Amino acid sequence: MAGELADKKDRDASPSKEERKRSRTPDRERDRDRDRKSSPSKDRKRHRSRDRRRGGSRSRSRSRSKSAERERRHKERERDKERDRNKKDRDRDKDGHRRDKDRKRSSLSPGRGKDFKSRKDRDSKKDEEDEHGDKKPKAQPLSLEELLAKKKAEEEAEAKPKFLSKAEREAEALKRRQQEVEERQRMLEEERKKRKQFQDLGRKMLEDPQERERRERRERMERETNGNEDEEGRQKIREEKDKSKELHAIKERYLGGIKKRRRTRHLNDRKFVFEWDASEDTSIDYNPLYKERHQVQLLGRGFIAGIDLKQQKREQSRFYGDLMEKRRTLEEKEQEEARFRKLRKKEAKQRWDDRHWSQKKLDEMTDRDWRIFREDYSITTKGGKIPNPIRSWKDSSLPPHILEVIDKCGYKEPTPIQRQAIPIGLQNRDIIGVAETGSGKTAAFLIPLLVWITTLPKIDRIEESDQGPYAIILAPTRELAQQIEEETIKFGKPLGIRTVAVIGGISREDQGFRLRMGCEIVIATPGRLIDVLENRYLVPSRCTYVVLDEADRMIDMGFEPDVQKILEHMPVSNQKPDTDEAEDPEKMLANFESGKHKYRQTVMFTATMPPAVERLARSYLRRPAVVYIGSAGKPHERVEQKVFLMSESEKRKKLLAILEQGFDPPIIIFVNQKKGCDVLAKSLEKMGYNACTLHGGKGQEQREFALSNLKAGAKDILVATDVAGRGIDIQDVSMVVNYDMAKNIEDYIHRIGRTGRAGKSGVAITFLTKEDSAVFYELKQAILESPVSSCPPELANHPDAQHKPGTILTKKRREETIFA
């Protein structure tokens, strides 16, 4: 049955081949017509050539026209063959596709396979005959229509769904499965390698150091062994190259070679030629005998050929030394010994003089030591004939009873301002002390005053008690005056020196009664002192010691006319001359022990030096000695400054968050207005904090009560205005909060100076708003100069913090815009 089907199929296939042959001729004609249409220029050329032949000369050779016609026909025949060959290729592709299908069917029926094979043989024979019958034509490029048709056919073939048999689908599934298995195995292998690497690393970290050292040594030896093998191969190649170079050099030297002609320099050449001949290079030696010199390995103190160069040098020097010793006379030997002794003595003296000043006695101090001493304590002086500072209380020239009082008051070591101001004050010279707050200025002017008062006869002091005090100390605020009074009583009471405070808020009659009873020192505020002077409660006829404490603060508060009025009440009979005599200690100490005839001494202490203070100093001070301690007008280096930019409504919440951090009491909070001070204190008390207030609206008793409670520890927080910003010494203040920023940088510096006193550290926190932009620039500079503070970027990058207020900014020329 299968054979009959195959025969029938052959019969059906044979007529189709005959029809295919017949259909070739119309196809050729159709292609020829298309070529004629696509190339009308060729037809025109043919018509022209015919016309030329008709109208031309008959004498033209007929053989030439026949050959041209023959060439044309040959070209057309070649073109037809090329088209037939292309069509044959297309038919062959179709037959191949059909054969693949038949092969699949033949796998199911063996009979079909045999018929198909015979048919295939017949087709291949026919194709071979066709190929042998026609010559291979010249390849022609495909036309544009054929390219487009081919591309369209490919797109359609790709768009059609491809049918896959069951076997092909199974093969595809098997292939995908195999790829998935390989990918999984690869990932497992990578994970295994990473785990092994991690375990090896952990094992190396946990293993014994000795075991790790042995393992590293073993690995290093293995690497060296492998490296030595490679090195030996490289060494052999190197030796062969060196041998060839050495042989070449010997041949050139002794057998003669082509010598390179050296370039000669002509006279007209501008450039000098620095060239050396290659044979003149003696730095490289290719002979291994000289290249690798043998180093002899010796044990102990062995030497090559028994020669010890060091020993030879020693013996040689000893020989010449003995020879010179024999030639020297006795006098020369003595001179040499004296020279050595002098040299040793000079070196010992140099070492002795180079000791630190703390290891020397007072009489051993040199000018260099005093300069180092001043640098150690940041002391800078200005003025003529300034005495040296005191190193300690024992080294000072103070009387024993004064030293005893100082020791009882707990002053172990003098502060920098005390070290320099006390010796100047003992010479009866005018002083301007510029020092930071909390530097011990009170004792600096009190101790010279107490020394002078105690030198006066006690009888004179009692008899002349109705003529007024010996000293007047002016302070800008009541609190500072009371603080100075406490210190003065502490020093003066053991010495029998009476002190009276003349300040506002206390009955004037009580103060007048105490003044009539007699006193040596009066501590006053400018306003109340003028009132007392005008009402004749006080007569400054024997006042020869005037102190202006916190002079810059007094000027800022508008007390400059009052201070000038007070100084005009002083007697002029004991005023110093404004000459060089004011700098001469001998003339200044004349009549030092008399109460009336001693020159008046004026002392001014300030934290800053504004122009108004300088003007006051020029008017009433005579040739003063100026003492600068540290960086005047700048905050403590031990105070950490923190700044927060916020709105007014956020201040209270931020303050409570800061207080919850647990800062140790006492804490001072500064506010600009009296009303705000009371409101903030009440709100803090409602939150459970112990707070008290201090401002100018409070009575004197209330102010004293608030300060005493804070110092005693009954209250933890003091809410104050700028009244508490200057001069008030409250020990161990851990934090200062500027709830409202000060109006100028000087007040800000004095505010934060309440903490970080007496060598301790502190924290100063400031709340800033947009209204405080006038002080942004100076505040930024103050924070940047502090070594323990950091400026926040909100303040550092703020436009108002880039330039000082009032400066006119001009654009650079390259930033200017020119409008034409």
Swiss-Prot record:
There is a cross-link at K686, K811 (Glycyl lysine isopeptide (Lys-Gly) (interchain with G-Cter in SUMO2)). Residues 422-627 form the Helicase ATP-binding domain. InterPro entries: DEAD/DEAH_box_helicase_dom (IPR011545), Helicase_ATP-bd (IPR014001), Helicase_C-like (IPR001650), P-loop_NTPase (IPR027417), RNA-helicase_DEAD-box_CS (IPR000629), RNA_helicase_DEAD_Q_motif (IPR014014). Residues 1-244 are annotated as: Disordered. It holds the Pfam family DDX23. It is found in: Nucleus; Chromosome. Residues 43-65 have a biased composition (Basic residues). It is an enzyme of class 3 (hydrolase). A motif (Q motif) lies at residues 391-419. A motif (DEAD box) lies at residues 549-552. ATP binds at A435, E436, T437, G438, S439, G440, K441, T442. GO terms for cellular component: chromatin; nucleus; spliceosomal complex. Its EC number is 3.6.4.13. GO terms for biological process: mRNA processing; R-loop processing; RNA splicing. Involved in pre-mRNA splicing and its phosphorylated form (by SRPK2) is required for spliceosomal B complex formation. Independently of its spliceosome formation function, required for the suppression of incorrect R-loops formed during transcription; R-loops are composed of a DNA:RNA hybrid and the associated non-template single-stranded DNA. The phosphorylated form (by SRPK2) is a component of the U4/U6-U5 tri-snRNP complex composed of the U4, U6 and U5 snRNAs and at least PRPF3, PRPF4, PRPF6, PRPF8, PRPF31, SNRNP200, TXNL4A, WDR57, SNRNP40, DDX23, CD2BP2, PPIH, SNU13, EFTUD2, SART1 and USP39. Identified in the spliceosome C complex. Interacts with ERBB4. Interacts with ERCC6. This is Probable ATP-dependent RNA helicase DDX23. It comes from Pongo abelii.
